[in-house]
Amino acid sequence: MKTVINRTRETDATAALLSSRHCLLCGAEELEIVLDLGETGLANNLPAAGACGGEPVFPLRLARCRRCTHVQLADRVAPELLYGHYLYVSSASSTLDRHLRSLAGAIAARTGPGPDGLGRSLDIGCNDGTLAAHMSRLGFQAHGIDPAENLAPLARARGIAVEVDYFGREIARSLRNRLGAMRVLTATNSFPHIPELNGYLEGVAELLEPGGVFVIEAHYLLDLVEQCAFDTIYHEHCHFWRLEPMMALFARHGLEIFDCERLPVHHGQLRVWAQRSGAGARPVSGRVAAQCA
């Protein structure tokens, strides 16, 4: 059964807009606009018939950093407007549900059981708990975190303990004190949504077990260009990733990417597997260098 959640919200569009003058990865004030899609409404924010005319619109522009080559949104919408009452529900797509079930199996195969079984996992941006529920069924002690208050009851109905908050260093420290370190951290299709990634990755480093894995999936810039997938550009997606800038960012936070995969889902994504730098738990796959070539 598909779940549909509607939202009606009034806002001052000017007050809700945050413009970036600096690169969200390296901090350089060397951004150049590479694509301007004009002003658009928020994705999935479709008013009922007869109620059109008052929806806010915001600039939608891509900028490239001349220094580190990262591509990001030039203008961002305030997160409380985007995520306070979130519209997209993972379980509404049977294709995505199968994809996340497959991901859970791949994670279990890679990590394997320890003395305490498969251990604890946390899905960052867990939405309605679809991935966390698949992890739980495999034997993980699955948890979730998501800022959308309206989605938490859907995840809890699946038996997932959900923290309603944005992920970062402080909440990671709190979770570690209460639950312990996590063997697995996941962020599927939520990693591109995070504007300020330094605090986020500090949280990952705080919460991840020494031999644990951090798995993300994110829209891949090359696929966006090759497939002209402009429909993946909207206000929630702050970043459009290549592997090299991501590797440099992770390294600054003591994390090492040891494998990557290109996926066809969502017009093309990159799945990245990371661990603590120097952990030595897993060798770096040749696919990492090949993807950077």
Question: Where are each of the predicted segments found?
Answer:
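Extended interfacial segments that mediate partner engagement and assembly in macromolecular machines
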Residues: E55-N150, L154, A229, Y234
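A short glycine-rich, Lys/Arg-flanked "PGG" loop and its adjoining helix->strand segment in the class I
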Residues: N198-V213
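N-terminal juxtadomain amphipathic helix
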Residues: K2-T95, E261, R271-W273
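Flexible, glycine-/basic-rich loop-and-beta segments that form/coincide
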Residues: H267-A293
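Conserved SAM-binding strand-loop segment of SAM-dependent methyltransferases
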Residues: G159-A172
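A conserved beta-strand element that flanks and buttresses the S-adenosyl-L-methionine
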Residues: R183-T186
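Short, glycine-/aromatic-enriched active-site segment of Class I SAM-dependent methyltransferases
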Residues: F214-H239, L243-P245, F250
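Short amphipathic alpha-helix with an adjacent loop that forms part of the alpha/beta core around
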Residues: E170-G180
